[in-house]
Amino acid sequence: MRSIFTDKVSDTMPLPEYPRPQLVRDGWQNLNGLYDYKISDSSEKKPKDIDGKILVPFAPECFLSKVEKGLKPTERLWYFKKFSLNDNLKGKSILLHFGAVDWECKVYINDTFVGSHIGGYCAFTFDITDFLRDGENELSVCVFDPTDSGWQQRGKQVNKTHGFWYTATSGIWQTVWLEAVDSCYIRKLDVVPDIDNNLISIDIDLSAEMKGVKIKARIMDGDSVLAEKTVKQHDEIKLKKYEYWSPENPKLYDLFITVSVGDKAVDSVKSYFGMRKFSIGRDKKGITRLFLNNEPYFQKGLLDQGYWCDGGLTAPTDEAMIFDISEMKRLGFNMLRKHIKVEPMRWYYHCDRLGMLVWQDMVSGGAYIGDFYAGVLPNVGIYKLKDNKYNRFSRGDKKWRRNYYEELEEMIKQLYSVTSIYCWVPFNEAWGQFDALKVCDFVRSLDSHRVIDHASGWYDQGGGDIDSMHKYILPIHLRKSKKRAFVVTEFGGYSNIVRGHTWNEKKAFGYLMFKSKESLTKAYKKLLDKQIIPIIDKGLSGTVYTQVSDVENEVNGIYTYDRAVLKIDENVLKDINSQLRY
């Protein structure tokens, strides 16, 4: 199936944009493009022949990859790419970056093993300087991905699609790129704004301990210098004058960091930040609310699964990423709940600069918990089950739980400085849920500056900052909580098949189906008018309607899967969103 962006995808260099806007250097080289590939048996020996060409970074299962073939749990997917360093990278140390590879991969340069990584959703890096030779080099990657036959974090990926379970994403699905650095460089830069004390905190992780290191920071607003300071690796920078960041005013400031050893500058990077504060608090009526910049702020959101009919988990172009964010904002929404997926860093950058709040889910794992726990009990109003009986929600093995913690920490550290991320969501509807209270404490220990929805939807353990309700069948009712803000974190899901713009019309799935745009719009308006708007003054602090677009057989998007047709009248969407406020 083609999207409205399919024809804009380059066969030689798809997604050519700089992949990490939060930490920008001049010396880099994009390795996206056509690779040789081979799907082999379980042997990890380098194959002698190839099956054909694959367009990276699109997974083999999707249309844009030019393969359109899945990877079995017993197979290995091999990639081969010959490359030479661009002139501006020569004479430096070379880092090889992968935005994401699903799930386990081993990386080789010129047939020499470089390193491995486990986890399908986060970025990782290898220093390949000592493996390179003059002239042409070869990158080889071997991937193993068990999808739903394994226990790993994988979201809704399955080997056999049905309902709201989707086509797997195997192998490389985000940008592959090279970066040139010196012997001492900034490995990681964290920035935390503090509007209560008019400052930012910075944390700079250097690759090496060296004598005579000096670090200079400069904060810019366009051409104007707001602050300059020689800083330590852990330091604060005061700001005298600034604007708050918000969806209505997504003001960002540039941050330039230069590292010198003696008189020589060894690293220079550009970053950015927004001055904002996320919290919960009491309004004038004493109701616990979501707060933005110390003021109550109603969040009107959409569930955003980040799937594309032509690219799977990979947006076909940067423009496509921007479309979903800017179009939802144009329709009056101010929040996206990024549902059990971690996006490329450019997606978060676009949310930062366009002004879109993000609730970030952790990717779910474990085996399916079964229809009784996943559907029957919650839909008759039973939410009070403890999650420390690990087999109940498919986390019986210690290694499953340990791996979850490892990947959760990896995600939070990667996204820590994203301006727009408002809330962490460790668990969704009990899929692989365990020890949610302890996990909430763990998340808080990593990041105390954001709100936490510790168990979105079903089996609430009474922790976190959000009293989180999912309602698709029974009527929505208000739950009052003194300590937590009440948010309907999933609802609606009203469905409509648009002929010629649907993945599979015969297998189309939805909770409540409507025959036309008019009937769908009327039902949407009635749902919001009758069940949402009346309870805002009484305690509702935010909503998440399901969802941004159709996804495969699931036809409950406000847009079709190809992003060609808006299925609900835009004037109604805008009018209702204008009423969703305190």
Ranges and model annotations:
Residues L189-P193, F256-M328, Q579:
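N-terminal carbohydrate-binding accessory modules
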